[in-house]
């Protein structure tokens, strides 16, 4: 409680002190007798010389941050993200997306998934013959070609300007390839290509990127442009460790896909003060009986005049995703799902000082509008009696998010304080159809809902650089997220299923940890880095769906196993309602995270370890209707990446060891009991998996890579894999080992 009060006071003070500081700095600048300019403290980092600079950058920051570059050892994005502490993915091979899980939570509003700083809102709907009654699988995710990803940043539990708006527990930002990643320094033109081929369902893929950059406008100015094109050919099936084809437990011929993507960027820099970037990213695919098209555009402007009071960034973005279903779905005919999102994020950072204390004040605003629309019954006659009001396919609605955020960073000697305060105002609108006359609900008639969520979100992070070997930090963050359209306007029974009183979630996260850096630990020139974090998160109003029935006199009653035989005798068999509501009991998540990096040049090792308890209520609609599945993390998991560099570090040979402790999956045969133990069941023991890899940097232009995944050909099921909860596996009609067996992958990259 004391920490909350301190954070609120500190957050309010951040704005006041920041504005006061600006006025003070202006007075200093206006003083003509003052001829000496004092710049903020410059801190030197050794990460630029490290071969894993993104990881090192994150390990040097106070707080629970992780980053990974493009060096993925030919692994999938699921493997790359699962190798980070406190980070996981929701695996669903039918989606074609990347779905990030942070500390056991996933989805729009819980984890802010971004591409180049632009929030993503795509809601995948994948027809699947393995689901209950042929219902499609649904999941929030990012449509992005892995060949375009140059870096991924993960933020867990602390605020980070606009990235933390409407993000309950953290964010994930995928950075795409840019002009500087294609054109060598000093050159005007550049070409970069990469190609990969893998067995056991991996298929083949390739990318070619062309870029040019030249001086323009002024001696410091430039203009550049790039175009990247990527394509994949992914098989419809793979084999597990027993040699059993996935067509027997989770895929069919419609899973064969050939996605293609394009990325364009134009950079205009008239001088050192102005920097403008225009970008367009496109994704197209056809698989699981649907066409997927995604179009994303953004404009970035950075203004940095010769003043420490002005460092302005503007981000304008617009995106849309379209899914059209080639074949009729169960009871719906053909359908279409559309979502679009427009956003603007403007912020300014000012730097000033008072005596020996440096201040950095950021003030910004983020506006975002997201809309979902659907159309069903396409191709059916006018006598088609089923309506769009009584099916859970692609809930529609419009959400507006308005926010103001601020952050004040105070540095004095070895001590640093980050004080943050933001305000979120959300409105979600949409049509609630009239309820069936046989059911008592409120409002009974048709109405346009407008559900509002608003509140202040303070945060505080304190850190100290006592010694390089011990740099402790402690933080508190209050975060909130508004309900999304898929929760408010879920409609398996039309208006009866919609909850006009749904509240947003609120989370209080406490973190304590430290960073450590030890150069020359064992031998001259080596380095050791460590980040350790302990966290505790308490979530109020946790949103999940439950099953309801229509009892006597049209009364809606919860199907939680408490109905008497007499009450069951009066239940109307025509209704089985799923409604999203708020948990009365707070949900608590806590755990430990550890990341370590040792590099001695010829030998290196990276370790990521997570231990957590992230148990939370599950949504019955996930098992029956295919909505977002449970996201409870394994109790422990660890990834060790270790290897050696040979021939002047041109050749690298290494191994990745993956350990996963007890994991759980949602039981598709739930009986409506509200106890989580009846909805989550233990997975079979997951063996330790070892991958081997090697690469050879022939010269600065050419490199070749090779890897063997699951080298021991172990038979197991990945944690948080959608297939694990399919009805055919639960009923014993298919094997439960859904992970791929031994797989060989080879790749090459050419850049000149």
Model-predicted regions and their roles:
Residues 188, 192, 198-293, 662:
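Periplasmic-side early beta-strands and strand-to-turn transitions of outer-membrane beta-barrels
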Residues 411-417, 426, 527-538, 557-669, ...:
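Gram-negative outer-membrane beta-barrel transporters
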Residues 153-156, 163, 171-214:
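Short strand-turn segments of transmembrane beta-barrel domains in outer membranes
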Residues 31-182:
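Acidic, small-polar-rich N-terminal luminal/periplasmic segments of exported/outer-membrane proteins
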Residues 123, 240, 480, 538-541, ...:
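C-terminal beta-signal and adjacent terminal beta-strands/loops
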Residues 269-271, 317, 358-362, 366-368, ...:
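Structural signature of Gram-negative outer-membrane beta-barrels, strongest in the C-terminal barrel
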């Amino acid at each position: 409680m004391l920490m909350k009060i301190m954070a609120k006071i500190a957050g309010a003070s951040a704005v006041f002190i920041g504005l006061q500081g600006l006025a003070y700095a202006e007075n200093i600048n206006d003083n003509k007798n003052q001829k000496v300019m004092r710049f903020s403290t410059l801190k030197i980092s050794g990460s630029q010389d490290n071969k894993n600079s993104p990881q090192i950058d994150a390990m040097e920051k106070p707080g629970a941050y992780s980053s990974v570059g493009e060096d993925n050892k030919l692994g999938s994005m699921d493997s790359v993200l699962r190798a980070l502490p406190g980070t996981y993915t929701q695996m669903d091979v039918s989606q074609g997306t990347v779905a990030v899980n942070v500390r056991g939570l996933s989805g729009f509003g819980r984890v802010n998934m971004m591409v180049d700083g632009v929030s993503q809102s795509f809601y995948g709907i994948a027809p699947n013959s393995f689901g209950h009654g042929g219902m499609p699988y649904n999941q929030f995710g990012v449509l992005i070609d892995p060949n375009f990803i140059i870096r991924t940043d993960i933020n867990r539990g602390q605020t980070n300007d606009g990235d933390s708006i409407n993000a309950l527990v953290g964010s994930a930002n995928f950075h795409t390839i840019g002009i500087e990643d294609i054109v060598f320094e000093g050159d005007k033109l550049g070409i970069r290509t990469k190609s990969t081929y893998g067995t056991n369902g991996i298929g083949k893929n390739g990318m070619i990127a062309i870029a040019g950059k030249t001086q323009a406008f002024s001696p410091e100015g430039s203009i550049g442009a790039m175009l990247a094109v990527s394509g994949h050919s992914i098989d419809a099936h793979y084999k597990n460790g027993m040699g059993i084809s996935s067509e027997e437990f989770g895929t069919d011929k419609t899973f064969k896909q050939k996605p293609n993507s394009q990325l364009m960027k134009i950079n205009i820099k008239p001088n050192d003060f102005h920097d403008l970037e225009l970008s367009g990213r496109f994704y197209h695919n056809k698989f699981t009986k649907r066409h997927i098209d995604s179009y994303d555009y953004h404009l970035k402007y950075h203004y940095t005049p010769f003043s420490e009071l002005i460092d302005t960034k503007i981000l304008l973005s617009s995106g849309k995703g379209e899914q059209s279903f080639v074949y009729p779905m169960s009871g719906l005919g053909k359908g279409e799902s559309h979502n679009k999102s427009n956003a603007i994020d403007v912020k300014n950072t000012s730097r000033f000082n008072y005596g020996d204390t440096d201040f950095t004040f950021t003030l910004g605003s983020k506006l975002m509008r997201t809309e979902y629309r659907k159309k069903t019954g396409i191709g059916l006659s006018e006598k088609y009696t089923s309506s769009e009001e009584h099916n859970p396919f692609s809930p529609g609605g419009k959400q507006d998010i308005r926010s103001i955020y601020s952050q004040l960073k105070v540095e004095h000697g070895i001590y640093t304080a980050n004080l943050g305060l933001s305000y979120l105002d959300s409105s979600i609108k949409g049509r609630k159809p009239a309820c069936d006359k046989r059911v008592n609900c409120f409002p009974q008639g048709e109405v346009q809902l407008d559900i509002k969520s608003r509140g202040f979100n303070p945060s505080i992070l304190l850190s100290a650089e006592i010694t390089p070997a011990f740099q402790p930090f402690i933080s508190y963050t209050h975060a909130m997220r508004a309900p999304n359209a898929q929760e408010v306007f879920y409609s398996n029974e039309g208006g009866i299923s919609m909850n006009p009183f749904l509240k947003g979630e609120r989370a209080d996260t406490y973190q304590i940890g430290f960073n450590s850096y030890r150069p020359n630990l064992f031998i001259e020139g080596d380095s050791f880095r460590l980040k350790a974090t302990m966290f505790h998160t308490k979530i109020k109003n946790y949103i999940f769906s439950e099953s309801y029935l229509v009892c006597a006199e049209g009364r809606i009653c919860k199907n939680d196993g408490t109905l008497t035989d007499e009450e069951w005798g009066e239940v109307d068999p025509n209704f089985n309602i799923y409604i999203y509501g708020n948990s009365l009991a707070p949900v608590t998540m806590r755990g430990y995270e550890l990341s370590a990096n040792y590099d001695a040049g010829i030998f290196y090792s990276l370790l990521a370890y997570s231990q957590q308890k992230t148990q939370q209520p599950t949504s019955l609609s996930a098992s029956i209707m295919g909505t977002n599945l449970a996201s409870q993390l394994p109790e422990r998991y660890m990834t060790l990446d270790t290897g050696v560099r040979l021939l002047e570090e041109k050749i690298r040979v290494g191994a990745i060891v993956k350990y996963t402790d007890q994991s759980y999956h949602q039981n598709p045969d739930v009986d409506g009991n509200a106890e989580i133990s009846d909805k989550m069941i233990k997975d079979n023991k997951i063996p330790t998996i070892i991958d081997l890899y090697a690469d050879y940097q022939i010269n600065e232009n050419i490199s070749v890579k090779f890897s063997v995944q699951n080298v021991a050909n172990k038979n197991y099921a990945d944690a948080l894999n959608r297939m694990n909860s399919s009805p055919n596996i639960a009923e014993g009609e298919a094997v439960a080992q859904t992970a791929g067996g031994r797989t060989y992958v080879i790749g090459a990259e050419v850049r000149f």
